[in-house]
């Protein structure tokens, strides 16, 4: 079993002790009595030991108030102790500040801060400031009895004794990690939302381009298709017109022959008219206007003229028939000419329209190709963002799982979890030891703590009590019983035997004779413990291994 033992303390310029320091061997005898008048400095040893171990006063005063008010400097405490078979030398002071620790002759390297160095030292010696004030020292100044502590403070003390404080540290660390996980999750959420938004922007842009380009391409393609159809139609119509034009065969123009026959017919008609005029003259009779001879219808000349008329009429009829035939040919010829001209004009116009349609189609085709080439595809960017998003989702999934597991750990580290189970296991032992010591001090009641460290006090034939309802003497019995119980529990749990006990003015308070006798019996049974009883009352020095007297000489305390 490990042993916590104070060997020696040397101090100066602390409280009422001046430059001429005090040196006390702490492991010399089993019981030491320290006496002196009020204000004589008999409790200064306790302040020196507390300051040496923890850098704090034992009483509720500021650290600077420990410095001797006359010299106002060079407070120095030197403390020798043993723990776990290692010898420690602690040197601590103020004005100037000093904090040195030597283990088995080797000085420890100081941490970055004195606070960290102090925490490291307390881990080395297995003792905290709160534990020290509950299991090593029982006093009236600077001491708050266990029952005077708040429920959280009671629990904290017991957790320290049961060494489940590590679970509290684990809980703090776990909660810090959960906060970090929450922070990382928030950062990932921001990144995820940002990437999703970027992907959406790219996709929207692609869709917008598809819509705009698609609508434009559709419009252009429709234009191109219409122009191509128009060109094909024009080409077909031109080919058809050419074929019709080729099929039109023009003979020799009959117009001249027609006109010539017309002239001939006109001349013959004129002759006929002249002949008929002469015949009429003969029929009418009278004198010839030329020869003045008598004209008669029976004249032979009339017969000859009629023959001429008949001859001319026959010729005229032949010419008229021929002329009518030529008229048909002339009309047909002219119709063919008109058709040729119309087809030629139509072909020319359609060729121009075809050329215009082809030119437009080429321009539209170029516009289609340009519109297609201007489409921006964000596939690569989207793929990279999606890959990053997948990584974030995977990381976030891992964080969520870790947070879930840490949530389970949080439940386990709650007061109702592992710590609660450990405390519940020790509660019966607490109550057994408390009542063991109360019995030694002849208490006529049973004191019980529950898992929330609320007390129940029962006495045969009387109603339940509370700690506050007791007299100061009975409270002192309970406080002493708890002190020795915590010492026992600390020893059982840690495997450390605490070989030092300091009782500061405990016997000067509300204890009655039976209570003092009971405490004395407990102390006398602690064979391997150095007990220091600080008191201003009269005691029998013969009952103690040594008697140290503190007294004021002038303004300073000395040991005599």
UniProtKB/Swiss-Prot annotation:
Question: PANTHER family in the record, alphabetically?
Answer: ABC TRANSPORTER ABCH.3
User: Its GO biological process terms?
Assistant: degradation of host chromosome by virus; double-strand break repair; symbiont-mediated suppression of host gene expression
Which gene is transcribed and translated to give this protein?
A: 46
Keyword Cytoplasm carried by entry = no
The entry's function note states: Exonuclease that plays a role in viral genome replication, DNA recombination, and host DNA degradation.
Query: Which keywords describe this protein according to UniProt?
Result: ATP-binding, Bacterial host gene expression shutoff by virus, Degradation of host chromosome by virus, DNA damage, DNA repair, DNA-binding, Exonuclease, Host gene expression shutoff by virus, Host-virus interaction, Hydrolase, Nuclease, Nucleotide-binding
What's the name of the protein? Exonuclease subunit 2
Q: How does it assemble?
A: Consists of two subunits: gp46 and gp47.
The entry sums up its family as follows: To phage T5 protein D13 and to yeast RAD52.
InterPro entries the UniProt entry points to: P-loop_NTPase, Rad50/SbcC_AAA
Keyword Transport appears in the UniProt entry: no
What EC number(s) is this enzyme filed under? 3.1.11.-
Q: Which residues are involved in binding ATP?
A: 36-43
Q: Annotated Gene Ontology MF terms?
A: ATP binding; ATP hydrolysis activity; DNA binding; exonuclease activity
Going by the entry's taxonomy, the superkingdom of the source organism is recorded as Viruses
Leader sequence residues: none
